[in-house]
Amino acid sequence: MKIISLCLCALMMPLLLVAQQVKSPNGNVVVSFSLVDNGVPTYKVSYKGKPVIKQSRLGLELTPSQNDGIKAEDTNLMNGFKVSNTETSSFKEVWKPVWGETSSILNHYNEMAVSLTQEHPNRTIIVRFRVYNDGMGLRYEFPRQSNLGYFIIKDEHTQFAMAGDHTAWWLPGDYDTQEYETVTSKLSEIRSKMKAAVTDNTSQTTFSETGVQTSLQMKSSDGLYINLHEAACVNYPTMHLNLDDKNMVFESWLTPDAQGNKAYMQAPRTTPWRTLIVSDDARDMLSSNLILNLNEPCQYDDTSWIKPVKYCGVWWEMIVGRKSWSYTDEFPAVEIGVTDFSKAKPNGRHGATTAEVKRYIDFAAKNGLDQVLVEGWNIGWEDWFGHSKFKVFDFQTPYPDFDIKALNEYAHSKGVKLLMHHETSASAMNYERYMEDAYKLMNKYGYNSVKSGYVGNIIPRGEHHYGQVMNNHYLYAVTEAAKHKIMVNAHEATRPTGLCRTYPNLIGNESARGTEYEAFGGNNPDHTVILPFTRLQGGPMDYTPGIFETQLKNWSSNQSYVHTTLAGQLALYLVMYSPLQMAADLPEHYEKYSDAFQFIRDVAVDWDDSKYIEAEPGDYITVARKAKGTDNWFIGGKCDENGHKAVIKLDFLDKGKTYECTIYSDAADADYEKNPKAYSIIRKQVKRGDVLKINEARGGGFGVSLFVKK
């Protein structure tokens, strides 16, 4: 169903000193725009009468360019403006995502587009505001015009003036990685806590003592939840935020390229949306579709080949350190196309062997999993990292002990597919050189999804993971994959901004610390009750949950441990939404706890409806989801190191139906550090209106399945 209503009102007017307003459909969110001083564009935002963003400046700064006709005195797009036109409109539709947390999404907003003109030189930009019941988006637009055709953005100066010294859940600003632990502090404390927030990880490099990444979640002292992010980041660098901590004003901070410039533009063009989500209920932050709604509709006519995936794989044992991606220890350096692996002595630790992959295929087939990821199948892993090497992989040639043809045939005979792995070692140029042949190889053997990786320093050298060049590369990989009906799960790529609506074969991203960090010292217990408020605002995460043997030293030489209980791992299949979900542990570990593994067998990966029952950033999240095309529900609850008691009223169940309810929860003595594998399974019948009360241990959680009784 689609309902569209448009009402346009164009007003020619002189320079305004009074504010122009646009309100959300329900009137709760009010955005006011005005020009101040010497034609400086500003805006402010309120929610239910409370200030959210105080008067904040808008504008951009260009780089002088003789070729583009931009003189040094013409680089200012921050003042000297007059309002030349204002248009307001309303829009309402219901659209259906290819996959998602719900089967339909309401897109309802009021809009105001303000045309701003500078007389000398004569040029116009448009600032467009879209205001929703749960927030707003704004962007800059550059119409086709003679005095602003080609131009280079030196800096973007979009401000977000906070109304107080809010509590924030933040990551240090970084051009190349989001793999930090979240810091919780007042905004005024960011500067003092920045140094401790950075580890000696060589991939972590901050740009400012008060610079942070988006999505940034905050909470005001009077109970407002506020989130700053961006939507539809296309052909533009990723935005960070730099804080003036004397005045509590954030300003946009764009990722530079190798020359220090930010974005190369050709009109007509738009920037990404700068987004604000706001509510006095934390649950609204998690259920918001504002980011998705600000993206363009799906660009594909046929999406029948795009399917959510539940998978296992040859991965965790390498992450823990018990097996390796590389095939041999004989070659300190590899030259693709020259080095002969057929005569090399195997190191005995290689994970991606034909025999091992068959074992995982058998496990997947037995337990109803769709695919098996295999990392380390292709030549080149012996010297893949740290050398700024251009030609690292060819994405086509398997190691001698990996029979790509036989394994795919074996998998297909079992009703399972293999999931391809393309680690690029951040050599994007090399990947693009081989991409077409790599995708053709996948088509030849029946792969329909690929996990890509970008570990290391970017090639082209000097570029950053989150600059305009690489953002274009990531999207190019997705759109080229679509031509081959391939789904993409990109790791180490830029953080998502809702592009999965437009390109739904972008089925997963990493872009944060995932489960792998549990083998590198561990994630804090509150990690997975923060990420849904921050990282997941832009799109789903391939978090790779499901670790049952949480004490790694019990089965490997790794001394780290997973900072959740076993039941808490089950919760992640609901709390950490993704249409791509991994059963990440080893098959033999699941066999030891087959009764608990039943929840992973049963849980869906695509949904008709989702209900966030209770939530507080960094403390707890409880969510219920209805499996796509069924009457069955699943509930997940996760908490931090303090534990939690979830109270769940089953008022979302269908009237008149009885449900077989299975509760997988922490045992009374469970504790993520002292007794992580203590869990309880309770079965009973429930109906609409019943109440479940479930105790969550420190670092714990639970999963609940609700099947309609037949």
Write out the residue ranges for each language-model feature.
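Carbohydrate-binding surface patches
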Residues: 617-655, 702-705
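Catalytic cores of secreted or luminal carbohydrate-active enzymes
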Residues: 567-614
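N-terminal accessory beta-strand-rich subdomains and adjacent acidic, glycine-rich linkers
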Residues: 21-302
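An acidic-aromatic substrate-binding cleft motif
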Residues: 266-359, 367, 371
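Aromatic- and carboxylate-enriched substrate-binding clefts and catalytic-loop regions
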Residues: 375-565
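Bacterial Sec-dependent N-terminal signal peptides
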Residues: 1-21
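Catalytic domains of carbohydrate-active enzymes, especially glycoside hydrolases
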Residues: 356-377, 444-448
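C-terminal beta-strand-rich structural cap/linker in extracellular carbohydrate-active enzymes
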Residues: 683-710
